[in-house]
Amino acid sequence: MDSSKPMFLDIETNGLDPDTIWVAVTMQDGVVQEHYTPESLTQALAGKFKVVGHNLIGFDMPVLWKLWNIHVDKSRIEDTLVMSRLSNPSREGGHRLSNWGEILNFPKGDYNDWSCLTPEMVKYCIQDVKVTAKAYDKLKLELRKFSKESIDLEHDVQHIIQKQTKNGWLLDLRHSMDLLADLKETKMKLEWAVHQNFKPKWVDVKEVTPKLKKDGSLSKVGLTDDEFTKVIESGCMEPFMRRVLKPFNLGSRKQIGEYLQDFGWKPEKFTPTDQPIVDESILFAVKDIPEAQLIAKYLMLQKRVAQVQSWVEAANDDTDRIHGYVNTLGAVTNRMTHSKPNLAQVPASYSPYGKQCRQCFIARDGYKLVGFDASGLELRMLAHYMNDQEYTNEILNGDIHTANQGLAGLESRDQAKTFIYALLYGAGDSKLGSVAGGGAKLGGQLKQRFMSNLPAFANLKDSIAREAASGVIKGLDGRVLHIRSEHSALNTLLQSAGAIVMKKALQLLEEYGRLHSLDYYFVGNIHDEVQAEVRAGQEDSYGRLAVSCLEAAGSFYSLNCPLTGEYKVGESWADTH
């Protein structure tokens, strides 16, 4: 057996939150070993070779540390789940080991009884290890065009986020329950107000033709009691339309759209089935129809109730902490995604009930919440790739949105702010034109004027479009990014670059935070912000270090536009972002 080759590892336990490890299986250079004691596995893992497993960072290693006191240095760990997500975040069938078995035509098999150790369980574990080894070989080929830096960074970030998930984020349960009660009461009152304005309607059901019996009298077949009586009283045997009084259903977006059109609403966005799109963001913009505002407020409250309810339900019964799931490579741009619950969707403080929602998330006793975020991240990434000194200077020393206003010929700074992000997100001419109150023609003119006045942008856009024709482009740190469409290529590049520098800053902060003996726990990593619990008295030391790590991340990648950010200290998330 060649002890320099990677060792593949898998364990079987008595559940996802286990207190027993039944068996650990290792395979190195084709030699399979079963381990039933910590001593046996510890001996097998001794050395400098790589240790490879599927979700090794997220499950196996934390369990081995907790139950068998076994630790493997992170520099030795390679996780095929991380590798699979990095290679192709949108892999058909997903990233589970079972899907890899299908991809490789080497099924991992099925087993579901984790209550006791059985020969079948051991056989299942051995097969998992063999599938992992084959997946690893395939992934090494897939990742051959990725830089080592990008692969190492994503493994480090997975380690950090695993600790964040384990730590969780403390929920102020009393405040959350009070907020939930308030939201439900307000929603109930609004429901009453809605039904005062949205009255039941008579709707046609079907045409009914009265029939006669053989003796010439009216038959009751096919008629309701009321219809039978009316036909008898009127003596009219002509077909008639059956109608019913249909109450307004607040749960039906289709009905909401129909009623609002009766009130004078002219929808502009439609579903593929030609139904008007109804959501609170669209309806809040309909200022001249009170009924639209009423529905918008209701839909907003409905969403807030569901959100706060999901946080309360997710909080651990013993600790009140939320251990949300984070996929560190969930988006095609390699941004993190969040679920169970989705804390990336917690409303901003300026949104309706946003401040109260963010006040739900706090720090433990003796700690403060410290949040830091990057300043103008996507525009700084744009400036890096354009490498236009004048534009970069506007970001660093001027007002970039006023500059963009002039470049596009827009009437206001607010329009310019909306315009530039719409442009970067690949918006079409109609969307761009709507920013200034026009249509596709105006949008095309604005875009053309902007690109004519900023040739570096036009050149970058053309260059990325040519590269994206192959279906992939190179990311900031040498990773490969999959492109879904040409119009999304630039946005994918910029968002990915932003995600990469934030991950690098996180990696540096974890390294230097420990070196400086700071006492902190990450609780949230959401796009361009990082939230942490920091021991009281160390807040400013941590905050200054966090911002310096962000700046260092920009220097590490030799960005043409320097990065910076700011940090805030408070009792809750409402204070820190």
Region locations from a protein language model:
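Conserved DEDDh/DEDDy metal-dependent 3′-5′ exonuclease domain
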Residues: 2-8, 15-142, 376
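Metal-dependent catalytic core segments for phosphate chemistry
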Residues: 19-23, 371, 378-408
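Conserved catalytic core of nucleic-acid polymerases
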Residues: 329-331, 406-526, 531-536, 566-577
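Conserved catalytic palm subdomain of right-hand nucleotidyl-transferase polymerases, strongest
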Residues: 77-81, 361-377, 423-426, 432-438
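Extended active-site and interfacial segments that coordinate phosphate-rich ligands
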Residues: 336-365, 377-396, 547
